[in-house]
């Protein structure tokens, strides 16, 4: 017996000889159920392409979750364009039921789309059964973070983790039940607790933004029943997607201190090959944003940085819904950095993108915001049902000589004749003299208005070379119209 114990101890020691620290610590208690697993090693980490990371219930021995490292994270090349792709013939149904990895197979079609049979990592996030491709392990020098499938851990359970040899290059793995174990908190926060804290160090109610949003009930009826999620300063590398939420405030401790980001784009998480997404109300949801609030209304976001870490069609933030308010938010993306479908108010926000930086159906009211872009600042797609993008006292910074304010080119035979963009008292920096780029004949009925644009010294911009479809407003003749567009209630309807 003594020899067996000694042999087991030697095995554990050999398996862990290059681990400096585990998070959660081995034997930790009061661990959040949305925790990531982190190893800090003695040398820089290289991820292997074989083996399993497994989590077991320590009491029952039941396998709770498993990551197969032989499966690629997701696509690395764009899927072929399908000219036969259509918008869903019936509106997409946002079911309000607990769909998680524990009760549903990731990849289960949630709409009229077909099963995707390609072999990639899949994780149900925020009730989206089709799942998201994800990185099961992410390295930063000597640190490796393991991302379990969402919603697999439960309150009041003790778990142990095993890691096969080969999962991490040069690491013998963890084989013993005693090698890495932890116990989760005994119970969830009380449902009557309307203030939830997220802290990346595990000292809050949740360790991730996604964990907090998963906890909050769908479709809350009033502000009195609403929740506030306070996010402590930290680096939150997570793909965030939630749906059907109302009357929730997500507030960071500070804008620069709270960074929520992930490597996501249209290549990594594409729309179904046979289904078009985004543009038409009620169509199949997009999965390419780093952070998406889908079919959500009456939300408030404050003091956060939201960023995608990939190039391409890659939103930092995608929001679908009505009456959503954003204050002091920094959004960083590439093409389509911000996609906003539904009425949104943006106060003192910063938006940085690569081109078509602001996309969507609107309406959006931007007040004292700063927008930077390498290509066109916006591609507005509102219909006659609502206003488009209205900017009041905003600052546009061009990052290249081709950073025109917007464009309305022919879009595969379709255009946006009711598109609307209004600039009032805005600062323009390094913007081409013609202002707007291409406007196809099919969009010449668009409303593009400008009033009192000036440079960084406050001097009036020379608008004599503007695109002729970009109308300059007169302070006397158009005073009433300027007043209307300056009123967010008139623009947004609330």
Regions found by a protein language model. Give the residues of each.
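Acidic, low-complexity Ser/Thr/Gly/Pro-rich repeat segments typical of extracellular/periplasmic
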Residues: 16-189
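Short glycine-/acidic-enriched loop or helix-start segments at secondary-structure transitions
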Residues: 5, 50, 240-241
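Bacterial Sec-dependent N-terminal signal peptides
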Residues: 1-16
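Short N-terminal micro-motifs specific to bacterial/archaeal maturation
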Residues: 6, 28, 150, 155, ...
């Amino acid at each position: 017996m003594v020899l067996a114990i000694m042999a087991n101890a030697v095995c554990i020691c050999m398996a862990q000889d290059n681990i400096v620290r585990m998070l959660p610590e081995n034997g930790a208690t009061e661990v959040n159920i949305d925790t990531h697993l982190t190893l800090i090693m003695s040398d820089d980490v290289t991820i292997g392409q074989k083996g399993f990371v497994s989590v077991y219930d320590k009491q029952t021995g039941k396998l709770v979750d498993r990551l197969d490292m032989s499966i690629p994270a997701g696509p690395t090349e764009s899927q072929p364009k399908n000219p036969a792709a259509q918008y869903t013939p019936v509106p997409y149904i946002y079911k309000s039921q607990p769909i998680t990895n524990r009760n549903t197979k990731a990849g289960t079609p949630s709409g009229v789309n077909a099963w995707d049979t390609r072999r990639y990592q899949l994780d149900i996030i925020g009730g989206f059964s089709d799942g998201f491709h994800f990185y099961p392990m992410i390295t930063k020098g000597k640190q490796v973070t393991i991302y379990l499938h969402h919603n697999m851990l439960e309150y009041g359970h003790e778990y142990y983790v095993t890691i096969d040899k080969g999962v991490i290059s040069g690491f013998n793995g963890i084989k013993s039940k005693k090698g890495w174990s932890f116990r989760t908190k005994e119970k969830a926060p009380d449902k009557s607790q309307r203030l939830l804290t997220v802290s990346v160090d595990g000292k809050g109610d949740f360790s991730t933004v996604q964990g907090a949003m998963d906890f909050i009930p769908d479709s809350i009826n009033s502000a009195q029943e609403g929740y506030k999620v306070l996010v402590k300063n930290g680096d939150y590398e997570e793909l965030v997607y939630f749906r059907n939420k109302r009357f929730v405030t997500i507030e960071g401790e500070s804008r620069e201190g709270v960074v929520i980001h992930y490597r996501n784009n249209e290549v990594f998480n594409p729309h179904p090959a046979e289904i078009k997404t985004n543009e038409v109300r009620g169509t199949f949801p997009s999965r390419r944003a780093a952070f998406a609030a889908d079919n959500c209304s009456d939300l408030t976001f404050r003091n956060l940085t939201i960023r995608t870490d990939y190039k391409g069609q890659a939103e930092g933030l995608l929001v679908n819904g009505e009456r959503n308010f954003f204050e002091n938010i920094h959004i960083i993306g590439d093409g389509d950095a911000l996609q906003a479908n539904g009425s949104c108010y943006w106060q003192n926000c910063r938006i940085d993108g690569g081109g078509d930086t602001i996309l969507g159906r609107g309406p959006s009211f931007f007040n004292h915001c700063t927008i930077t872009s390498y290509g066109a600042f916006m591609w507005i797609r509102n219909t006659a049902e609502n206003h488009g993008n209205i900017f009041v006292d905003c600052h546009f910074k061009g990052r290249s000589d081709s950073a025109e304010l917007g464009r309305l080119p022919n879009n595969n035979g379709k255009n946006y004749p009711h598109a609307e963009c209004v600039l009032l008292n805005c600062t323009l920096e390094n913007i081409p003299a013609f202002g707007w780029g291409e406007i196809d004949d099919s969009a010449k009925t668009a409303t593009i208005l400008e009033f009192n644009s000036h440079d960084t010294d406050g001097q009036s911009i020379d608008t004599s070379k503007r695109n002729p479809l970009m109308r300059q407003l007169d302070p006397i003749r158009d005073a009433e119209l300027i007043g209307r567009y300056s009123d967010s209630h008139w623009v947004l309807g609330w």
